[in-house]
Amino acid sequence: MSTAPRYTINRSIVILRYKQAFLDWLMSADPNPPQDMTLDDLGDDGDAFMIPGENVVDNMQDAVKWVEKHWGMFFEHTLEGWLVDESLWPQKRTLKMFREWFTIEYRSMVWDLVNAPILTEDWEESEDGAEDTLH
Protein backbone atom coordinates (compact mmCIF):
# COMPACT_ATOMS: atom_id res chain seq x y z
CA MET A 1 0.00 0.00 0.00
CA SER A 2 1.42 3.36 -1.05
CA THR A 3 1.63 6.19 1.46
CA ALA A 4 2.36 8.82 -1.19
CA PRO A 5 -0.05 11.74 -1.61
CA ARG A 6 -2.83 10.65 -3.90
CA TYR A 7 -5.46 13.38 -4.32
CA THR A 8 -5.10 16.94 -5.48
CA ILE A 9 -7.63 19.71 -5.01
CA ASN A 10 -8.67 21.89 -7.94
CA ARG A 11 -7.23 24.97 -6.28
CA SER A 12 -3.91 26.76 -6.03
CA ILE A 13 -2.51 28.37 -2.89
CA VAL A 14 -1.26 31.90 -2.35
CA ILE A 15 0.42 33.18 0.78
CA LEU A 16 1.03 36.85 1.48
CA ARG A 17 4.44 37.43 3.02
CA TYR A 18 4.91 40.66 4.90
CA LYS A 19 7.49 43.22 3.85
CA GLN A 20 9.24 45.76 6.06
CA ALA A 21 6.71 48.47 5.13
CA PHE A 22 3.91 46.43 6.73
CA LEU A 23 5.91 45.86 9.89
CA ASP A 24 6.78 49.57 10.10
CA TRP A 25 3.10 50.50 9.78
CA LEU A 26 2.01 47.89 12.34
CA MET A 27 4.52 49.07 14.92
CA SER A 28 3.39 52.69 14.48
CA ALA A 29 -0.38 52.04 14.28
CA ASP A 30 -0.81 49.47 17.05
CA PRO A 31 -1.49 51.19 20.39
CA ASN A 32 0.27 48.28 22.13
CA PRO A 33 2.76 46.97 19.59
CA PRO A 34 4.47 43.68 20.28
CA GLN A 35 7.98 44.32 21.56
CA ASP A 36 10.86 43.37 19.27
CA MET A 37 8.55 42.11 16.47
CA THR A 38 10.45 41.01 13.37
CA LEU A 39 9.44 40.03 9.85
CA ASP A 40 10.20 36.42 10.77
CA ASP A 41 7.78 36.70 13.70
CA LEU A 42 5.08 38.05 11.39
CA GLY A 43 5.48 35.16 9.00
CA ASP A 44 5.35 32.42 11.62
CA ASP A 45 1.66 31.61 11.14
CA GLY A 46 0.15 33.48 8.25
CA ASP A 47 -2.94 32.59 6.27
CA ALA A 48 -2.86 30.48 3.12
CA PHE A 49 -5.56 31.27 0.58
CA MET A 50 -6.99 28.77 -1.89
CA ILE A 51 -7.60 30.44 -5.23
CA PRO A 52 -8.74 29.03 -8.58
CA GLY A 53 -6.47 26.37 -9.96
CA GLU A 54 -5.84 25.05 -13.43
CA ASN A 55 -7.47 26.84 -16.38
CA VAL A 56 -7.71 30.09 -14.38
CA VAL A 57 -4.44 30.30 -12.45
CA ASP A 58 -1.73 28.19 -14.09
CA ASN A 59 1.44 29.96 -12.99
CA MET A 60 2.92 32.67 -10.80
CA GLN A 61 1.99 35.45 -13.25
CA ASP A 62 -1.65 34.33 -13.24
CA ALA A 63 -1.62 34.13 -9.43
CA VAL A 64 -0.28 37.67 -9.10
CA LYS A 65 -2.91 38.95 -11.56
CA TRP A 66 -5.67 37.14 -9.66
CA VAL A 67 -4.54 38.41 -6.26
CA GLU A 68 -4.08 41.95 -7.54
CA LYS A 69 -7.59 41.86 -9.02
CA HIS A 70 -8.85 41.15 -5.47
CA TRP A 71 -6.17 43.12 -3.61
CA GLY A 72 -8.66 45.12 -1.52
CA MET A 73 -10.19 42.00 0.02
CA PHE A 74 -6.76 40.55 0.81
CA PHE A 75 -5.60 43.87 2.27
CA GLU A 76 -8.64 44.28 4.53
CA HIS A 77 -8.55 40.65 5.67
CA THR A 78 -4.91 41.01 6.65
CA LEU A 79 -5.35 44.35 8.40
CA GLU A 80 -8.31 43.01 10.38
CA GLY A 81 -6.19 40.06 11.46
CA TRP A 82 -3.83 42.47 13.19
CA LEU A 83 -6.03 45.41 14.21
CA VAL A 84 -9.82 45.09 14.37
CA ASP A 85 -10.25 48.84 14.88
CA GLU A 86 -10.61 50.05 11.29
CA SER A 87 -9.85 53.63 12.33
CA LEU A 88 -6.23 52.51 12.79
CA TRP A 89 -5.97 51.19 9.24
CA PRO A 90 -4.39 53.25 6.46
CA GLN A 91 -7.25 55.26 4.97
CA LYS A 92 -5.89 55.54 1.43
CA ARG A 93 -5.01 51.97 0.56
CA THR A 94 -3.88 51.38 -3.00
CA LEU A 95 -2.61 48.54 -5.13
CA LYS A 96 0.79 50.26 -5.04
CA MET A 97 0.74 50.15 -1.23
CA PHE A 98 -0.35 46.51 -1.34
CA ARG A 99 2.66 45.68 -3.51
CA GLU A 100 4.96 47.58 -1.12
CA TRP A 101 3.61 45.74 1.93
CA PHE A 102 3.29 42.15 0.66
CA THR A 103 5.07 39.56 -1.43
CA ILE A 104 2.88 36.94 -3.07
CA GLU A 105 3.92 33.29 -2.88
CA TYR A 106 2.21 30.76 -5.14
CA ARG A 107 1.81 26.99 -5.00
CA SER A 108 0.18 25.22 -7.94
CA MET A 109 -0.46 21.85 -6.31
CA VAL A 110 -2.67 21.35 -3.28
CA TRP A 111 -2.52 17.78 -1.98
CA ASP A 112 -5.27 16.35 0.21
CA LEU A 113 -3.66 13.87 2.61
CA VAL A 114 -6.79 13.23 4.68
CA ASN A 115 -9.29 10.54 3.77
CA ALA A 116 -12.33 12.55 4.86
CA PRO A 117 -14.59 15.19 3.30
CA ILE A 118 -13.41 18.78 3.34
CA LEU A 119 -15.63 20.86 5.59
CA THR A 120 -15.99 24.60 5.16
CA GLU A 121 -16.82 27.17 7.79
CA ASP A 122 -18.40 30.51 6.91
CA TRP A 123 -16.71 33.09 9.14
CA GLU A 124 -18.85 35.97 8.03
CA GLU A 125 -22.23 36.50 6.41
CA SER A 126 -23.16 39.57 4.46
CA GLU A 127 -25.96 41.77 5.77
CA ASP A 128 -28.50 40.32 3.34
CA GLY A 129 -27.65 36.76 4.40
CA ALA A 130 -25.95 35.86 1.13
CA GLU A 131 -22.52 34.34 1.17
CA ASP A 132 -19.75 36.92 1.20
CA THR A 133 -17.14 34.90 -0.65
CA LEU A 134 -15.42 35.03 -4.00
CA HIS A 135 -16.69 31.66 -5.23
Predicted features, each with a name:
Residues G53-S126:
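Amphipathic protein-protein interaction modules
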Residues E124-H135:
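Short acidic DE-rich linear segments
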Residues M1-V57, D62:
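Extended, charge-biased low-complexity segments
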